[in-house]
């Protein structure tokens, strides 16, 4: 595809182009076009990110059916906060948040037959990133958190950011010696951010990887998690559920300790705490074990998850990515909710769309099922537009998220270049 033009298609639409011209009455030419027409960029890389992923994000936002004011608010946030944090274009720094190793991921969360919620996850980049000044990218994320705090975002709270970075992130001197002694040619970021766009508001989440702190301290990642949670138990009230999860991991998944965890950047008494697990064992038996914590929980509607497993034909082949899941723990909740992440990056978009349609029909989301293949028309026609499908089945309902390649102009064989910061 010509990188000088970007075309994205959506349900019953025309197109958004780099000039902003389109035929879709639903999105109108007022959002992305308005910002693109008179936008001033600090660098050519910012302009290219905006014309590529910025235009793609505009389409995602339009799918959430927010009104025009909400779309403006969200796009302004993307333009002013996210785009400057993406670094060089095309991207040159490897990131482990998705299968493309690009430091951004886009997703849609479907919570029923209504409109989905849009999310962006990013590994922020600055001139310090990956250098001896900030080898694990901690200072860059800290600076972005400071900027977010100054913006007066509704509900934004840095308390848990300060707590968990203090518990898990090393000092600058320790980071430098860690990079030298670890023998790693390049250090991956230790912490990243994600943003949910809901009704014109932005909800921020933070993730921290555990292995750097574990290696530097000589302590097991689970010991560090237990200690960190115990110090905020009077606010988060989640230690019982955390202990339940860690005991399961130590019994059934001991070869791969908790690789990372996340929380909401809100008041600690309202924040969820999520613990992630990874296994290279792709089988329904493993998935059932994960969902029941090795038999300790009676998972709500496990048979429904098994049907999704078969719809995705996960017994017929092994994905190239590991089987991933998380346990979501809410304040005061004695037991976690389980979310499975099923790799679909090895499938064609057509295969994935057919599976999603079948899944949505099974859930009774008939209109959403009928429209999903059409919503994919705006995505570039590659073999890997989709990366993951995640699902939670709880008493409140079924939550399904689909994750996508972040470059609207990306080609099938896009690879991170072998030069680094």
Swiss-Prot record:
EC number: 2.5.1.-
UniProt-annotated binding residues for L-tryptophan: 105
Domain of life: Eukaryota
GO terms under biological process: alkaloid metabolic process
Coiled coil: none
Keywords: Transferase
Swiss-Prot/TrEMBL catalytic activity: yaequinolone E + dimethylallyl diphosphate + H2O = [(1'E)-3'-hydroxy-3',7'-dimethylocta-1',6'-dien-1'-yl]-quinolinone B + diphosphate
InterPro entries (UniProt xref): Aro_prenylTrfase (IPR033964), Aro_prenylTrfase_DMATS (IPR017795)
Residues holding substrate: 119, 272, 274, 276, 341
Pfam families: Trp_DMAT
Pathway noted in the entry: Secondary metabolite biosynthesis; Alkaloid biosynthesis; Mycotoxin biosynthesis
Family: Belongs to the tryptophan dimethylallyltransferase family.
Known role: Prenyltransferase; part of the gene cluster that mediates the biosynthesis of the aspoquinolone mycotoxins. Within the pathway, the prenyltransferase asqH2 performs the second alkylation with DMAPP at delta(3') double bond to yield a carbenium ion intermediate, which can be attacked by H(2)O to yield a styrenyl quinolone containing a C3'-hydroxyprenyl chain. The first step of the pathway is catalyzed by the nonribosomal peptide synthetase asqK that condenses anthranilic acid and O-methyl-L-tyrosine to produce 4'-methoxycyclopeptin.
Protein name: Prenyltransferase asqH2
Organism: Emericella nidulans (strain FGSC A4 / ATCC 38163 / CBS 112.46 / NRRL 194 / M139) (Aspergillus nidulans)
Designated gene of the protein: asqH2
């Amino acid at each position: 595809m010509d990188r000088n033009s970007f075309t994205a298609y959506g349900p019953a639409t025309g197109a958004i182009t780099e000039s902003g011209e389109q035929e879709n009455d639903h999105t109108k030419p007022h959002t992305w076009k308005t910002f693109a027409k008179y936008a001033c960029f600090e660098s050519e890389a910012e302009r290219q990110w905006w014309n590529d992923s910025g235009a793609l994000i505009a389409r995602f936002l339009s799918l959430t059916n927010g009104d025009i004011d909400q779309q403006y608010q969200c796009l302004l946030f993307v333009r002013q906060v996210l785009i400057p944090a993406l670094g060089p274009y095309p991207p040159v720094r490897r990131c482990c948040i998705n299968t493309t190793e690009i430091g951004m991921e886009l997703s849609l969360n479907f919570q029923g037959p209504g409109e989905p919620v849009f999310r962006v996850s990013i590994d922020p980049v600055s001139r310090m990133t990956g250098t001896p000044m900030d080898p694990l990218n901690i200072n860059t994320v800290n600076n972005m958190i400071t900027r977010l705090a100054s913006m007066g975002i509704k509900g934004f709270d840095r308390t848990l950011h300060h707590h968990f970075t203090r518990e898990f992130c090393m000092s600058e001197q320790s980071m430098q010696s860690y990079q030298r002694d670890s023998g790693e040619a390049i250090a991956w970021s230790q912490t990243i951010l994600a943003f949910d766009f809901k009704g014109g508001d932005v909800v921020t989440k933070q993730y921290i990887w555990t292995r750097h702190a574990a290696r530097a301290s000589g302590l097991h990642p689970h010991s560090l998690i237990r200690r960190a949670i115990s110090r905020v138990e009077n606010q988060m009230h989640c230690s019982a559920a955390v202990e339940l999860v860690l005991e399961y991991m130590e019994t059934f998944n001991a070869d791969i300790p908790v690789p990372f965890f996340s929380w909401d950047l809100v008041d600690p008494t309202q924040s969820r705490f999520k613990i992630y697990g990874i296994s290279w064992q792709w089988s329904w038996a493993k998935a059932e074990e994960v969902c029941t914590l090795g038999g300790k929980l009676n998972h709500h509607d496990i048979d429904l998850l098994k049907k999704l497993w078969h719809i995705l034909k996960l017994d017929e082949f092994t994905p190239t990515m590991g089987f991933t899941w998380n346990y979501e723990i809410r304040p005061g909740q004695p037991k976690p909710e389980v979310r499975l992440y099923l790799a679909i990056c090895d499938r064609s978009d057509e295969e994935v769309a057919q599976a999603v349609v079948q899944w949505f029909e099974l859930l009774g989301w008939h209109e959403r099922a009928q429209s999903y293949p059409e919503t994919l028309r705006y995505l570039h026609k590659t073999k890997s537009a989709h990366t993951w499908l995640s699902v939670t089945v709880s008493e409140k309902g079924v939550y399904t998220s689909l994750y996508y390649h972040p470059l609207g102009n990306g080609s099938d064989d896009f690879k991170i270049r072998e030069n680094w910061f």
